[in-house]
């Protein structure tokens, strides 16, 4: 193999199952712990998430977001776990969905995994990703009147923000 060629990484078990069942996605790679990472399309997030739930991923351990860089996409990431009684090391997968920063909309997975409630609210509060269909999408950490999305890489901090007296 030439030095410039990257090694071919074989798709993981879940990615193969999704492909066999006709679910559009892209296998990215396993992470440093060997957890399979897949990329989903925002237009098909709900069918893909429902398929993963049907596969057995019944627990959303973490939903978070990050900014891929100034001018780049925002990413909503879902860490899913297959929880059962007799498994010492449960199966895990990470699903990433990339959304353009000028139209950061995704369907909410709250109706599949209730644990997405506060996590999607935090991603909305910090990055401005709008989770359509979420039952209570509003700021959770920042004051309601805060302008902007503080964890975006292109965010400009206000020089002064007046804290209001709570008394």
Swiss-Prot record:
Keywords: Membrane, NAD, NADP, Plastoquinone, Quinone, Thylakoid, Translocase, Transport
GO CC field: plasma membrane-derived thylakoid membrane
Molecular function via GO: NADH dehydrogenase (ubiquinone) activity; quinone binding
Membrane topology recorded in Swiss-Prot or TrEMBL: Peripheral membrane protein
Main location: membrane
Top-rank taxon, per record: Bacteria
GO biological process: photosynthesis, light reaction
Enzyme Commission designation: 7.1.1.-
Reaction catalysis annotation: a plastoquinone + NADH + (n+1) H(+)(in) = a plastoquinol + NAD(+) + n H(+)(out); a plastoquinone + NADPH + (n+1) H(+)(in) = a plastoquinol + NADP(+) + n H(+)(out)
UniProt keyword Endoplasmic reticulum present: no
KW Nucleotide-binding (keyword) present: no
Subcellular location: Cellular thylakoid membrane
Family classification: Belongs to the complex I 30 kDa subunit family.
PANTHER family (alphabetical): NADH DEHYDROGENASE [UBIQUINONE] IRON-SULFUR PROTEIN 3, MITOCHONDRIAL, NADH DEHYDROGENASE UBIQUINONE IRON-SULFUR PROTEIN 3
Quaternary structure (record): NDH-1 can be composed of about 15 different subunits; different subcomplexes with different compositions have been identified which probably have different functions.
Functional description taken from the UniProt entry: NDH-1 shuttles electrons from an unknown electron donor, via FMN and iron-sulfur (Fe-S) centers, to quinones in the respiratory and/or the photosynthetic chain. The immediate electron acceptor for the enzyme in this species is believed to be plastoquinone. Couples the redox reaction to proton translocation, and thus conserves the redox energy in a proton gradient. Cyanobacterial NDH-1 also plays a role in inorganic carbon-concentration.
Protein name, as recorded: NAD(P)H-quinone oxidoreductase subunit J
Organism this protein belongs to: Trichodesmium erythraeum (strain IMS101)
Gene name of the encoded protein: ndhJ
């Amino acid at each position: 193999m030439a030095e410039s060629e990257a090694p071919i990484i074989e798709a993981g078990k879940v990615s193969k199952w999704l492909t066999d069942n006709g679910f559009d996605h892209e296998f990215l790679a396993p992470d440093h712990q060997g957890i399979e990472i897949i990329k989903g399309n925002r237009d098909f997030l709900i069918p893909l998430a429902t398929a993963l739930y049907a596969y057995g991923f019944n627990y959303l351990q973490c939903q978070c977001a990050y900014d891929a860089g100034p001018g780049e996409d925002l990413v909503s990431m879902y860490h899913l776990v297959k929880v059962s009684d007799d498994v010492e090391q449960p199966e895990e997968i990470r699903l990433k969905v990339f959304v353009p920063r000028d139209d950061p909309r995704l369907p909410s997975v709250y109706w599949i995994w209730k644990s997405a409630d506060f996590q999607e609210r935090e991603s909305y509060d910090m990055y401005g990703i709008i989770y359509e269909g979420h039952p209570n999408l509003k700021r959770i950490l920042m004051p309601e009147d805060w302008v902007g999305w503080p964890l975006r890489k292109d965010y400009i901090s206000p020089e002064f923000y007046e804290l209001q007296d709570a008394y």
